[in-house]
Amino acid sequence: MDLIHTFLNLVAPPFTFFFLCLFLPPYWGLKFMVSILSWLLSENVAGKVVHITGASSGIGEYLAYEYAKRGACLALSARRETALHQVADTARHLGSPDVIVMRADVSKPEDCMRLIDQTVNHFGRLDHLVNNAAISIATLFEETPDISNLRPIMETNFWGSVYTTRYALQHLRKSRGKIVVMSSVDSWLPAPRRHIYSASKAALVSLYETLRVEVGSEIGITIVTPGYIESEITKGKFLSAQGEVDVDQDLRDVEVSAVPVGSVSGCAESIIKSTLRGDRCLTVPSWFRMTYLIKLLCPELLEWTFRLLYLTAPGTPTSDALSKKILDATGAKNLFYPPSIQSPDVKTD
């Protein structure tokens, strides 16, 4: 057996190289032609049924508006019912023929089952499932007194998507529908203080890439990896080391630094266009894909940069991080941060 592996270790690299040299040019040409056809034949969602989790704010809210503009029927869920009703009213005004709202916690399997059942019972079908609900963190791993305090991140970000997808699959098969998965560029970036959040987003990518193989062409899956987009997370809403939701905009300044924060409306528009084309994946803003290339080619450089920018010496306040000093010294916040994320009015429920 060891001899076989030794042989494969020698043969596999050159064989793979020559195979790719022959395969990639026609493959890329075919993909280009398919992308043109997909753009020309984008799905029409008028009258179709879309369920969006985490729809009370941020990307989920604006995805509801984009679907509404295209005439889709909406089922919106989140923990904040009052905010959901406000989103629903706007969606109706924008053109959605029917909108229902459901208060739910996607970390609970029974809530996820109820969400899908109520959607199908009301509309009679389900065409798109948008798994968007998420919470973030911004604390060093060793500074968390009880690591179990961070369980809600994985339970919401990962298991919440797992539960809703499992209960929705049979209905999506019938409609040959689509799943939109909200991962993050943090799924590949080694960002300090976002360890469990990054793990939850990376787990989503692995799960849905595997699920794509299992379901084949019956259900389309679009994996979205947003960068910094205006949302409650970029407003500074994090799960604290004590397991409580808190708002800390100084810490947000450390984490985001002088990186431009994208428009949530533009992000949502890009996501829905990508979904209707049937794209496999989308990174928005697209320039964040270069960070993945850097990670592949020189991971040590990426890790060193993150350590230099975001970490401070032991006993030194987090606000002394180089990332925040750069932000403050350049005045980049006024240029790169939308007014919406500089508002102190952020709900923590």
UniProtKB/Swiss-Prot annotation:
SUPFAM superfamilies: NAD(P)-binding Rossmann-fold domains (SSF51735). It is an enzyme of class 1 (oxidoreductase). The keyword Cell membrane does not apply. One of its GO terms (biological process) is steroid metabolic process. It catalyses: an 11beta-hydroxysteroid + NADP(+) = an 11-oxosteroid + NADPH + H(+). Substrate binds at residue 184. This is 11-beta-hydroxysteroid dehydrogenase A. Gene3D superfamilies: NAD(P)-binding Rossmann-like Domain. It is found in: Lipid droplet; Membrane. Coiled coil: none annotated. The chain crosses the membrane at residues 10-30.
